[in-house]
């Protein structure tokens, strides 16, 4: 599906413009935000959009993917939903060890994949670390997974999307939610996109790191039956 040799479309024009054309090949894009911010919907819509265009998406699911939502997106975005479904390889992980194995196994598909998604890369890390965001063994394992995915992205010129959860940094005299893994994970991701949800359901995506665009740029989007679509500033 090499219509654009450098980016994969997310399925939302506003997000694609924000990201400089879509999700970039050859690097890792991190989506983070609080619950219901739209992380899974952005990741899944990107995967389905890739599959509908004839590309192969590998989706490591640690969150319990809704098959009904998956089917809904296929029917909305693919002219042949059954064929598109065959282009999405879903691997379920139920604990930290299974996640690590699933991430390693993505290498088996890397030579023909266009996109690898891990949703979420830090869910089991949150459980392992308890209430303290430390750089212990659990974080090192997550960092190892990210660097493995980054090496696949660079070697095979594919795109990687990982979703990340948040915590409240009470030690920083702020109630602002911050991404789990902090600077460690940000170091290994080429793009960091923060997602927020506003009253009425409108979401905002804000660039916090990008290899070619300034930090702070943002776009509004909304979640629909067909995935994700642009929203105007008047909607929130």
UniProtKB/Swiss-Prot annotation:
InterPro entries: AAA+_ATPase, DNA_recomb/repair_Rad51_C, DNA_repair_and_recomb_RadB, P-loop_NTPase, RecA_ATP-bd. SUPFAM superfamilies: P-loop containing nucleoside triphosphate hydrolases. Keywords: ATP-binding, DNA damage, DNA recombination, DNA-binding, Nucleotide-binding. One of its GO terms (biological process) is DNA recombination. Coiled coil: none annotated. ATP binds at residues 33-40. It comes from the Archaea. GO terms for molecular function: ATP binding; ATP hydrolysis activity; ATP-dependent DNA damage sensor activity; damaged DNA binding. The keyword Oxidoreductase does not apply. Involved in DNA repair and in homologous recombination. May regulate the cleavage reactions of the branch-structured DNA. Has a very weak ATPase activity that is not stimulated by DNA. Binds DNA but does not promote DNA strands exchange. Belongs to the eukaryotic RecA-like protein family. RadB subfamily. This is DNA repair and recombination protein RadB. The lineage of its organism: Archaea, Methanobacteriati, Methanobacteriota, Stenosarchaea group, Halobacteria. The gene is radB.
